[in-house]
Amino acid sequence: MKQLEKLIIEATVLTEPEAEVERVMQVCNACRYCEGFCAVFPAMTQRLEFGKADIHYLANLCHNCGACLHACQYAPPHEFAINVPKAMAQARLETYQQYAQPAAFGALYRRAGITVALALIVGLTLFLLLAMALKGSLIHPPLAGDFYQIFPHSLLAWMFGSVFVLAIGLLMAGVIRFWREISPGVPRSAEIAEASHNALTLKYLDGGHGKGCNEADDAFTLLRRRFHHFTFYGFMLCFAATVVATGYHYVAGWEAPYPFFSLPVMLGTLGGIGLLIGPAGLLWLNLRRSPLHGDARQKPMDRGFILLLFLTSLTGLALLAGRDTSGMGILLALHLGVVMALFLTLPYGKFAHGFFRCAALLKWAVEKRRGKHAGDTGN
């Protein structure tokens, strides 16, 4: 009786996207044709009903590869209209909104295009005006690449350090709450290792057969996986460049500017190239993708994030090329403005999907070893 009451309560509080995932999963659980495609379907088979936590877990476990859509006999125009990628994408947006910190800022996910545009305007205006205030002009005699003659190191470290730490802290607070609600128990080292491998290799963007995802049609391609790798590892190389440069400054006492063949500059250059190739490729695929894949309402969020990553790299490489010229001030202001816009939107844009997906992958690694109820206090 208590189980029935629980199901009734859950049914009454499901949002429309959550209810659609529940409907789709009930049909898929009866069919199971797609069981070998990715982690979603084996995880689905461990359940007879789908509560809110299950729905959000499965939605974030889905990588939107599209294989199940093109293999499904019940996909549109069938009257069942089973479209797993679309249902999961719509539920993921609910995840981001419901677990946003502070909660009121969850609405920014639905207005991500406007949010990115405003953040970009604020960031660019801030640093262009700041450069004018500190130097009196955006054009100056060549400064031999010394950025700190325009913006003091302490000012940049304080501004960007505080914004980045706050953004990651807010994002992690939501992910931790998500993790606790899907109740997977405490992960072991082998489970963490497997989830990390699956995340870093993007295992579930191979379509379940190694040939890749579906994009514009039912043809398989590994391009989305490749462009994601360029983007992620390009970002991580740029982050590594910042970490190394910070170590040079605070530990070794070596102040910028660093020569081109120094470790920070080489890491940043390679990362920047990756952040040009990856986002450009992802945007190209996004523009070509079948309208049946994913949620069309999220395209502004997807494209806004892609654009910010691309502009971060483009302005950074332009700054490197022009750092010994009289235009370094304006190039630096443009680059810092774009980076600030990226940092400001990290907790309320597409960046969040990587964190929630990693949590779902870790849950799956725990679940397939120990069962669905591993760590659940009520079971």
Curated annotation (Swiss-Prot):
GO molecular function, one term: metal ion binding
A GO BP annotation: citrate metabolic process
Residue numbers binding [4Fe-4S] cluster 1: C28, C31, C34, C72
Entry keyword annotation includes 4Fe-4S: yes
SUPFAM superfamilies xrefs: 4Fe-4S ferredoxins (SSF54862), Respiratory nitrate reductase 1 gamma chain (SSF103501)
Keywords: 4Fe-4S, Citrate utilization, Iron, Iron-sulfur, Metal-binding
Sites where the protein binds [4Fe-4S] cluster 2: C38, C62, C65, C68
Domain of life, source organism: Bacteria
TM region positions: none
Keyword Methyltransferase: no
Matches recorded under NCBIfam families: CitB (TIGR02484), PRK15033.1 (NF011607)
Name used for this protein in its record: Citrate utilization protein B
Origin species: Salmonella typhimurium (strain LT2 / SGSC1412 / ATCC 700720)
Gene symbol of the encoding locus: citB
